[in-house]
Amino acid sequence: MLNNKRLFTSESVTEGHPDKIADQVSDAILDAILKDDPNARVACETTVTTGMALIAGEISTTTYVDIPKVVRETIKEIGYTRAKYGYDYETMAILTAIDEQSPDIAQGVDKALEYRDKDSEEEIEATGAGDQGLMFGYATNETETYMPLAIYLSHQLAKRLSDVRKDGTLNYLRPDGKVQVTVEYDENDNPVRIDTIVVSTQHADDVTLEQIQEDIKAHVIYPTVPENLINEQTKFYINPTGRFVIGGPQGDAGLTGRKIIVDTYGGYARHGGGCFSGKDPTKVDRSAAYAARYVAKNIVAAGLADQCEVQLAYAIGVAEPVSIAIDTFGTGKVSEGQLVEAVRKHFDLRPAGIIKMLDLKQPIYKQTAAYGHFGRTDVLFPWEKLDKVEELKDAVKY
């Protein structure tokens, strides 16, 4: 008999993972700048390795930020507070290599191509995209957060892993960790059970593997994953190498923008390739990806599709997107052409329009840099609002 069930896997990492340290540092610097200079241009990259961090990039701003102080505060908050962890906020070296934004790029952002020969003082019209590129947003009704179940549970487990370390429940845990969840779908594409959960967590040298496995199940997995999704066939792999003492930047170098699938939809939807962290909202890699999620989520919440993927694309120095594409994977209640028409009418997808629509000049980015930019339950980001649902319903009758 043919088995029509399928498996899909996504992963997340904790805030102490080297790549996520880099993301959080880059976004902490961005926030510190935006707090005093909302119009700053920031492209901040971070590299972390044993005993040091390198901060590089292009920043144009009217304010001053003590970058080493921001870096140390961020590392401390994550939990690298002792030299024995292989990374310590007090003793680490911090190198900075910061230039200003290229004037060639700035002229295209400051004055969009469409309005370069006109006397438009309207910022929404005047601002061009900070780069070319394509961005995707996605939503599905398989969870209350409009996220695929595998990435949603991966983030929840990774956050729980960090929480039990920080609150002392499992005080032998260390900051680095990874989680992976495999979901089984039935023939109608509904999630029915968890097939496999993988948890790898850094730990103190003096704790046994058996204790770690028992504690992770009791304090991380069972309180987080709904009981009806786990059965006797569910497989658990907890620290399957047997030992994870050396971790964080001592174990692996980390770099901003290396966890773009963790940051988005866990591989369930397409990705344009651009990362988010360390970029101010004139960079459409970030702001347009947020806008695409905003559009997709409101379409699904309006009942116009069970799942929806939105692609936006831009040319550097040009305000209007060069293309808008929508794919509902056969679940749409109306044609994709009708949806595109409604989106053009009710969403301003020019860079400055996105910034205004989603209020993106706020210093809100550090909290996006771990446990996902989308579908969060611990904080409500502007691109997660469902305030366009009624407008979309009215615009598209079926």
From Swiss-Prot:
Q: Which GO terms describe its biological process?
A: one-carbon metabolic process; S-adenosylmethionine biosynthetic process
- Tell me where it mainly resides: cytoplasm
Top-level taxon of origin:
Bacteria
- Molecular function (GO) terms listed? ATP binding; magnesium ion binding; methionine adenosyltransferase activity
The entry marks the following residues as binding Mg(2+), namely 19
Q: Which residues bind K(+)?
A: 45
Details of cofactor binding:
Binds 2 divalent ions per subunit.
Needed cofactors: Mg(2+); K(+)
Q: Which residues bind L-methionine?
A: 58, 101, 252, 283
Which PROSITE patterns does its entry note?
A: ADOMET_SYNTHASE_1, ADOMET_SYNTHASE_2
Name the residues that bind ATP: 17, 176-178, 243-244, 252, 258-259, 279
Instruction: Indicate whether Nucleotidyltransferase appears among the record's keywords.
Output: no
Q: Where in the cell is it found?
A: Cytoplasm
Kindly tell me the pathway this chain contributes to: Amino-acid biosynthesis; S-adenosyl-L-methionine biosynthesis; S-adenosyl-L-methionine from L-methionine: step 1/1
Q: Which InterPro entries does the record cross-reference, listed alphabetically?
A: ADOMET_SYNTHASE_CS, S-AdoMet_synt_C, S-AdoMet_synt_central, S-AdoMet_synt_N, S-AdoMet_synthetase, S-AdoMet_synthetase_sfam
Q: Where is the signal peptide?
A: none
Residue numbers spanned by region Flexible loop: 101-111
Going by the record, the broad EC class of this enzyme is: transferase
Pfam families, from UniProt? S-AdoMet_synt_C, S-AdoMet_synt_M, S-AdoMet_synt_N
HAMAP family per the record?
S_AdoMet_synth1
Q: How does it assemble?
A: Homotetramer; dimer of dimers.
The similarity annotation says: Belongs to the AdoMet synthase family.
Q: What does this protein do?
A: Catalyzes the formation of S-adenosylmethionine (AdoMet) from methionine and ATP. The overall synthetic reaction is composed of two sequential steps, AdoMet formation and the subsequent tripolyphosphate hydrolysis which occurs prior to release of AdoMet from the enzyme.
Q: What is this protein called?
A: S-adenosylmethionine synthase
Its taxonomic placement starts with: Bacteria, Bacillati, Bacillota, Bacilli, Bacillales
> Which gene name does the record give?
metK
